[in-house]
Amino acid sequence: MVYAQNYAELLQTHIDSEADITLLYQSVDNAREEFINCDILNLNKQKGVESIEKNRGSAQKRNIFMDTYIMKKELFIELIKKARKISSMYTLPQIVNSLAGELDIRGVAHRGFFASITDFNSYYNANISLIDFKTADALFNPDWPIYTRTNDSCPTQYLEGASVKNSVISNGCLI
């Protein structure tokens, strides 16, 4: 998942709601074609999480779970222990889903750029979407820098005859 989020605000929302667990999600209107096999949240009208399931492409509008949880450490440890008793293959979303009827689990909508990288096609599409300045501006905010780029490699070299349009080029490339 690629997105920018102010976690202090998200934590405060969690504290104010007094929920046991808060999950971050992005509402999308292209889930039939995109986000296949990503987890989705089924919410009630109060944004309470009723279940977590896989997106099978059966509906256009879905709430894509962004794999972001907020809960107390003690609850997290308890969930891990419960999951381990069931199976070593049991995942955190599965144990949270199994307890959705017992715990107060809330969903909080994310606003802004969001990309789910699940295969080469989604990786390509996410990168190409960042060519648009408005899209890139939604992710790359000077007040919230993203530190992912190394600064010790040589810049890209554009050799004679190179023609580049609508491309995302990493440093250290020869074109």
Predicted ranges, named:
Residues 74, 82-175:
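Left-handed beta-helix
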Residues 5-83:
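Conserved core of the sugar-phosphate nucleotidyltransferase
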